Amino acid sequence: MNPTRGAVGGTDPRPAAVVLLSGGLDSATVLAIANQQGFACHALSFRYGQRHEVELAAARRVASALGVVRHVVVDIDLGVFGGSALTDPTIAVPAAGTAEEIPVTYVPARNTIFLSFGLALAETAGAWDVFIGASSVDYSGYPDCRPEYLAAYQAMANLATKATVSGERTLSVHAPLMHLSKADTIRLGLSLGVDYGLTHSCYDPGPDGRPCGRCDSCSLRERGFTEVGVPDPAGG
Amino acid sequence: MNPTRGAVGGTDPRPAAVVLLSGGLDSATVLAIANQQGFACHALSFRYGQRHEVELAAARRVASALGVVRHVVVDIDLGVFGGSALTDPTIAVPAAGTAEEIPVTYVPARNTIFLSFGLALAETAGAWDVFIGASSVDYSGYPDCRPEYLAAYQAMANLATKATVSGERTLSVHAPLMHLSKADTIRLGLSLGVDYGLTHSCYDPGPDGRPCGRCDSCSLRERGFTEVGVPDPAGG
């Protein structure tokens, strides 16, 4: 409705925050939360060689619908390292529940890389708050979604930048979904007016961008909407 | 001389290490140290919108001369954030000693971003050791070159990846130059056979790639060679 509420370095009186925005259900909810908390949000998305680039179109729709100060898309090539079904076309995306403990959809150091760009953006935007949609409930078992990881990241970040070492303020990494089930996340997002029809969760969409309905991410999403008792407006 | 000592996933019996290689004097020395310690080195360089892209040519020369298992160059666009004289053509590179406490050549979260890609490469290469040329002596005052920062990074990294959370082993971030002056670094590198004529340090080279002779990096390099009492083979 109001995609640009303020200009970079402009007169927006709200404190700036960086929100990692994938275009999925979780990060859309996090953006709504940060907005509701009164932050002027700088959304940050990545084109990282993922199979599901349809995510980025969803991120743009979500950023526009919920309102952000700006939306930065950074190109990074995680594919050069290989090792993940999300970036390596030779590795198949498994069906939900069939994977090993940490599944092949895990991308090495992904959240660490994403948060590090978030840290850079926070410094240049004058933001002291970085939001990420990590959750340790109903998640895929990725190590970089756990609270102890994020606490260690925040400790490191506060030693890392010109802004944080000034001692003036400390940077906070917020994961407001950390202890919410997928259903709780959906309930919260609906209460904040998130249109989940704009979001995309599937790891392995068809050529038309439609969700596969069988990967971990589709499965978690479907279970969430079923538990809430509302249909998934994205038709997942 | 022997640019490819082993193949990825091949029969190289040496443990793998990741070495961040900028093409400068420090990282060339670090690569020589890691080689001498018996590691099979995976060199990692970045094309990050820096003014001094001649660095990358130097990184390729150094990797080839000292010998690496492979040399990965990752494209990342730090320029989208602005805020540094190294990536923003509208900010002048200052002469040495004229800058504020943390100079405008500081790139927001640069080492955090570089190490995070290093962490990803370490995981896919099966490496437990990441080397970086950071030093807290004769340096430009960047917060992400200090030992407390690197210790916090290592703590975070050990919670971040599938490999590190297995509990099998811990990942180490090595900064073997941390407590060395530039002159000590040069002495060590010379004793290991580093050809500093292949390296490039200047933040603001001319169109022909020649060092400016006046930036912080040129100045530190010149003082180092003067202290050692040998000419800079790069003619800096």
From Swiss-Prot, chains A, B:
InterPro entries: QueC, Rossmann-like_a/b/a_fold. Its EC number is 6.3.4.20. The keyword Phosphoprotein does not apply. Zn(2+) binds at C202, C212, C215, C218. The keyword Ligase applies. GO terms for biological process: queuosine biosynthetic process. ATP binds at L21, S22, G23, G24, L25, D26, S27, A28, T29, V30, L31. It comes from the Bacteria. Belongs to the QueC family. Catalyzes the ATP-dependent conversion of 7-carboxy-7-deazaguanine (CDG) to 7-cyano-7-deazaguanine (preQ(0)). NCBIfam families: 7-cyano-7-deazaguanine synthase QueC (TIGR00364). This is 7-cyano-7-deazaguanine synthase. The lineage of its organism: Bacteria, Bacillati, Actinomycetota, Actinomycetes, Frankiales.
